[in-house]
């Protein structure tokens, strides 16, 4: 990370730390945190993710649809038990921040994830509760989330080696700066005062569920 990015990150962390003191969060329980799922033309993984979340007791789910055109998905939306926000155009992974929904969700704790990121079967069911507690323990951390599981990436995935190399470098770096380790979780900061991430409990590509701290930042 460059000196400029490090400085910017640290300033941002202090800014949101002070905002949290001045205007405390209204969220007291992890199950109250809204989960916004960014989706484009994915049905199978979307349903698997929502089923996994609800099975763990996390039901405050919203789907942000990036102008999907897949007929079976559009049909599913008609009976979907969750609120679906339909965008008029595909705004990509930054859709939440580029849409008016930013004002609704990004002024307190929120979870923003892709629809193809599924917690592994051996992931503890209280993972969001755990993330929430750990984020509270680290007041200068702005977000927290899974890291990728890389032992099951298919050879057909063209970026396999790139992902493995990147995750390996991050793991080696973070082991040297580990902030806490338990028999269930291994927490690791990815950058100074910016992010705490958990070892492989996510079984899908490309990124992981992240819990940004109140009033921003996110993956």
Predicted feature locations:
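N-proximal low-complexity "stem/linker" segments adjacent to membrane-targeting elements
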Residues: 1-51
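C-terminal catalytic/acceptor-binding lobe
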Residues: 3-18, 167-219
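Acidic donor-binding segment of Leloir-type glycosyltransferases
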Residues: 52-89
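Short, high-confidence coil segments that cap the C-terminus of an alpha-helix
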Residues: 58, 107, 140-141
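Conserved beta-strand scaffold positions in the cores of enzyme catalytic domains, especially
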Residues: 84-86, 110, 143
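Conserved catalytic core of nucleotide-sugar-dependent glycosyltransferases
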Residues: 93-95, 120-200
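Active-site nucleotide-sugar/metal-binding loop of Leloir-type enzymes
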Residues: 94-109
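Short beta-strand-to-loop acidic/aromatic patch adjacent to the donor-nucleotide binding site
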Residues: 106-122
């Amino acid at each position: 990370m460059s000196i400029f990015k490090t400085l910017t990150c640290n300033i941002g962390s202090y800014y949101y730390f002070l905002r949290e003191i001045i205007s405390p969060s209204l969220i007291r329980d992890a199950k109250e945190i809204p989960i916004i799922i960014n989706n484009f033309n994915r049905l199978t993984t979307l349903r698997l993710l929502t089923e996994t979340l609800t099975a763990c007791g996390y039901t405050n789910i919203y789907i942000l649809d990036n102008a999907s055109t897949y007929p079976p998905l559009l049909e599913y939306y008609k009976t979907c038990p969750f609120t679906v926000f339909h965008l008029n155009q595909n705004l990509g992974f930054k859709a939440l921040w580029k849409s008016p929904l930013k004002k609704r969700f990004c002024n307190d704790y929120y979870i923003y994830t892709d629809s193809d990121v599924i917690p592994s079967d051996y992931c503890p069911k209280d993972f969001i509760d755990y993330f929430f507690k750990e984020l509270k323990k680290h007041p200068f951390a702005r977000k927290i989330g899974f890291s990728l599981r890389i032992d099951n990436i298919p050879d057909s995935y063209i970026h396999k080696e790139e992902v493995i190399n990147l995750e390996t470098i991050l793991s080696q770096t973070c082991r040297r700066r580990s902030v806490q380790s338990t028999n269930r979780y291994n927490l690791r900061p990815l950058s100074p005062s910016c992010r705490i991430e958990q070892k492989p409990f996510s079984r899908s590509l490309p990124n992981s569920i992240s819990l940004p701290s109140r009033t921003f930042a996110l993956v």
